[in-house]
């Protein structure tokens, strides 16, 4: 009796890279600049004061400033935290 060996086809599994999202700070005419910098640093602990100042100035000058690019869950968290402190923020896909 002959034994037949069945070869298992080789499969490669590639992980799909999770999409990234941009957290944006929008300019407003209500909050003092120092307050915006403080909230940015409290919300995103990895930000230094000079980085927070740059983000605030970018929003002040151009209408929006890029706070951070990250996965969807932290992006939603950062956006909601900024909003809870009275700042205007949104998220968008990073292309």
From Swiss-Prot:
Residue ranges of coiled coil: none
* Pfam families according to UniProt: ClpS
> What start and end residues bound the annotated signal peptide?
none
InterPro entries (alphabetical): ClpS, ClpS_core, Ribosomal_bL12_C/ClpS-like
Any one GO BP annotation for this protein: proteolysis
Domain of life, source organism: Bacteria
The task this protein performs is described as: Involved in the modulation of the specificity of the ClpAP-mediated ATP-dependent protein degradation.
Q: Which NCBIfam families match?
A: PRK00033.1-4
| PANTHER family xrefs | ATP-DEPENDENT CLP PROTEASE ADAPTER PROTEIN CLPS, ATP-DEPENDENT CLP PROTEASE ADAPTER PROTEIN CLPS1, CHLOROPLASTIC
Q: How does it assemble?
A: Binds to the N-terminal domain of the chaperone ClpA.
Q: Which family does it belong to?
A: Belongs to the ClpS family.
Q: Mind telling me what this protein is named?
A: ATP-dependent Clp protease adapter protein ClpS
Which organism is this entry from? Answer: Synechococcus elongatus (strain ATCC 33912 / PCC 7942 / FACHB-805)
């Amino acid at each position: 009796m002959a034994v037949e060996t069945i070869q298992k086809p080789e499969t490669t599994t590639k992980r799909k890279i999770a999409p990234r999202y941009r957290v944006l700070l929008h300019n407003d005419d209500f909050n003092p600049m120092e307050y915006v910098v403080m909230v940015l640093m409290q919300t995103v602990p990895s930000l230094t004061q000079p980085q927070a100042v740059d983000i605030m100035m970018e929003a002040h000058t151009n209408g929006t400033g890029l706070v951070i690019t990250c996965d969807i869950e932290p992006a939603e968290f950062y956006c909601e935290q900024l909003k809870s402190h009275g700042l205007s923020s949104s998220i968008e896909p990073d292309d």
